[in-house]
């Protein structure tokens, strides 16, 4: 389901790039790949691309918490601010990585995603 979601978001992003800037990315390209291709096309430095992508990802997760826990706008903004140093740290660490370093596993996230997929009422796909 996460792969499907990433492709659907990628297709939406790809459509905006094509419609607004006439920049074409192949259909069914995953969102992170679309972001990387767009950053290269628009000459956005890698470090800014990483920071922007991670900040956007964290903000989206926190926005879900604001709406559904609810934690409120103030606490949500505080959470976003608290991510800045970690995002910078991740960006700095990534400067020395290569393709062989890519990978990851999130057992708890995967288990809860599987449980979430089987709920009758769902707010989001994953």
Label the model's feature ranges.
Residues 56-126:
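C-terminal auxiliary extensions adjacent to catalytic cores
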Residues 1-68, 78-81:
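Amphipathic alpha-helical interface segments
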């Amino acid at each position: 389901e996460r792969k499907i979601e990433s492709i659907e978001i990628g297709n939406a992003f790809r459509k905006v790039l094509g419609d607004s800037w006439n920049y074409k990315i192949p259909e069914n390209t995953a969102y992170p790949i679309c972001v990387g291709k767009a950053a290269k096309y628009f000459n956005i430095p890698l470090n800014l691309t990483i920071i922007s992508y991670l900040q956007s990802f964290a903000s989206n997760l926190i926005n879900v918490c604001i709406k559904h826990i609810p934690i409120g706008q103030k606490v949500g903004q505080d959470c976003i601010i608290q991510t800045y140093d970690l995002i910078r740290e991740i960006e700095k660490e990534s400067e020395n990585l290569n393709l062989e370093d890519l990978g990851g596993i999130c057992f708890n996230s995967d288990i809860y995603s599987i449980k979430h997929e089987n709920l009758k009422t769902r707010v989001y796909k994953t």
